Amino acid sequence: MPYVLISTQIRMETGPTIVGDEFSDTQLMAQLEADKRTVLGNNFSEYCVNEPPRVTLNKLEKLGYRVVSMTGVGQTLVWCLHKE
């Protein structure tokens, strides 16, 4: 899977960082040391790390991913990364 989306809440710049959904590459999620969780009331799971986005972005860069775009949506920051 060449694309990855990660996000965090602006008020939570120091983490946690959401790094994937229930359909994400499990090998990549293991490399990021992400835990799969389901928040009460949601009918989907997501992978999360207890690190700031900067640390996660650095890990993904070492794995060959590059930031394609970044945006703020309300109180959420989102990065899109791609691996050639």
Swiss-Prot record:
A Gene Ontology term for the protein's cellular component:
cytosol
Please indicate if the UniProt record lists Nucleus as a keyword: yes
Q: What is this protein called?
A: GTP cyclohydrolase 1 feedback regulatory protein
Tell me, how does this one assemble? Homopentamer. Forms a complex with GCH1 where a GCH1 homodecamer is sandwiched by two GFRP homopentamers.
Q: Which UniProt keywords apply?
A: Cytoplasm, Membrane, Nucleus
On the tree of life, the source organism's domain of life is Eukaryota
Q: Which family does it belong to?
A: Belongs to the GFRP family.
Q: Where in the cell is it found?
A: Nucleus; Nucleus membrane; Cytoplasm, Cytosol
InterPro entries in UniProt: GFRP_sf (IPR036717), GTP_CycHdrlase_I_reg (IPR009112)
Per the record, the gene is gchfr
Q: Does the keyword Hydrolase apply?
A: no
- According to its UniProt entry, this protein's organism is Xenopus tropicalis
Q: Which SUPFAM superfamilies match?
A: GTP cyclohydrolase I feedback regulatory protein, GFRP
| Function as written in the Swiss-Prot or TrEMBL entry | Mediates tetrahydrobiopterin inhibition of GTP cyclohydrolase 1.
Q: Name a single GO biological process.
A: negative regulation of biosynthetic process
